[in-house]
Amino acid sequence: MSEQNAKLAALLNEAELSEKPIEPVRGHIEGGIAQAYAIQQINVQRQLAAGRRVTGRKIGLTSAAVQKQLGVDQPDFGTLFDSMAVNDGEEIAWSRTLQPKCEAEVALVIERDLDHENITLIDLIGATAYALPAIEVVGSRIANWDINILDTVADNASAGLYVLGHTPVKLEGLDLRLAGMVMERAGQQVSLGVGAACLGHPLNAALWLARTLVKQGTPLKSGDVVLSGALGPLVAANPGDVFEARIQGLGSVRACFSPAS
């Protein structure tokens, strides 16, 4: 199986480098989600060997509707690297994206390691420095987004780029469950949501991640960014698009795409 994992990981990596999406890989993953994560990890190690630095994790499949659609009962996660970080309002070269779609999220920044067993919600809150509004630019190495849970897990949870807002906000006094979200493109509303759409509360998603990573031996560390999951529908991006997301209590963030090169 390790040889097959290496082959599939290489195909996904080549798809990213060549900017040419490939056919779904799920038909070659007989070991289920565990095997898909093993494939993901091969490419994580490839990125580290290339000099990339881990900056955090992203959580996907936090919507009950999407979970039902894909036939799963849990979220998934991927790894964020420094090469994926984009400043608020910075122009994103279209060549950095692959079938990009945008979704608005609550980002959490961790200030203390969460490396012990039986992490509680209070542990998570105490370890969180602040929250920020975020736009995640997801991308798929699988052609036409023809994915199921195995495809997206193997493909680093369809991670692409991420944009964080500039103004950190402490959790105290925030009601992230009821925080409304509006995302606009060129001034037109394209996505509407609320914190409760993310596993009932963005902190629920982050707690799931923290516990899962401890079990896998790769816990959240001080300084990590956690993209907690979409608050509303994701929207396909086109060259030249400018997205702005506003999240109640957190402010706004913009993702600005260059014209096609």
From Swiss-Prot:
List the Gene3D superfamilies hit by this protein, alphabetically: Fumarylacetoacetase-like, C-terminal domain
Q: Temperature-related activity notes?
A: Stable up to 35 degrees Celsius.
Q: Name one GO cellular component term.
A: cytoplasm
- Please list the cofactors this protein needs: Mg(2+); Mn(2+)
Query: What highest taxon heads this organism's lineage?
Result: Bacteria
Q: What is its EC number?
A: 4.2.1.80
Q: Name one GO molecular function term.
A: 2-oxopent-4-enoate hydratase activity
Q: How is the enzymatic or functional activity of this protein modulated?
A: Strongly inhibited by Fe(2+), Fe(3+), K(3)[Fe(CN)(6)], Ag(+), and Cu(2+).
One Pfam entry name: FAA_hydrolase
Reaction catalysed by this chain? (S)-4-hydroxy-2-oxopentanoate = (2Z)-2-hydroxypenta-2,4-dienoate + H2O
Tell me which InterPro entries the record gives: Fumarylacetoacetase-like_C (IPR011234), Fumarylacetoacetase_C_sf (IPR036663), Hydratase-Decarb/MhpD_sf (IPR050772)
Q: What class of enzyme is it?
A: lyase
Ordered alphabetically, the record's keywords are:
Aromatic hydrocarbons catabolism, Lyase, Magnesium, Manganese
Q: Could you tell me how activity relates to pH for this protein?
A: Optimum pH is 7.5. Stable in the range of pH 5.0-8.0.
GO biological process: one example: catabolic process
Described function: Involved in the modified meta-cleavage pathway for the 2-aminophenol catabolism.
State the similarity comment: Belongs to the hydratase/decarboxylase family.
Q: What assembly does the database describe for this protein?
A: Forms a complex with AmnE.
The entry's protein name is 2-oxopent-4-enoate hydratase
Its lineage opens with: Bacteria, Pseudomonadati, Pseudomonadota, Gammaproteobacteria, Pseudomonadales
